[in-house]
Amino acid sequence: MPIPDQIIWKTIADRYNQLWNLPNCVGSIDGKHIRIKAPANSGSSFFNYKGYFSVVLMATADADGKFITIDVGEYGRNSDGRVFKECTFGQLLLKNKLNLPKNSCLPHEENDPAFPYYFVADEAFPLLDNVMRPYPRRSLTNTKIIFNYRGRKSVECAFGMMASKFKILEGPINFKTERIETVIKAVCVLHNFIHVYDGKYSIPQEIQQEDVDILLYEDIEGNL
């Protein structure tokens, strides 16, 4: 998949702010283990912490659950953090070669310093100028809980929608490693094609209800 230019990154950020209320966010990052049959003479290289053999799909997704970048083929035993640092996307981000827009002020904070455009990720990823991790679990406010919840929702939805459509991902996939990578890349492209053909999904009401559920849960917990 081609790396977006600055105009497309800004379009992605605008949609993220519209749908998820995360200004300057240009995507969410996560890794997914794709179950495979153990390649010959591979030892434990593909054996992951979940107890099966896999290759890692490292992906970024936009606000609507469409993939922006994909990297496929890292050993299943590697952590998301390590895969991120070694994959093409991670290398481009770490070297500031993703063509991200220049820092800009957040909405209603025009007097504050300009803020970087960023990706959201979980605790397995490094905290960088352009990568935001969840707030630590201790002493979370309602606002922080909602941010943590929303952070990786779009990429998780992308993985879920893709897996529900393409049963080959239930695995184990029994091809040569190179063919497996080709199949996974093709599935990601088809996922995006179907997503565009079907139209963008709109989930503000779902988000609002989930946010309310989180707030109610916190109120109950606080009163126990």
Describe the function of each predicted region.
Residues 1-224:
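Short, well-ordered secondary-structure "scaffold" segments embedded in the functional core
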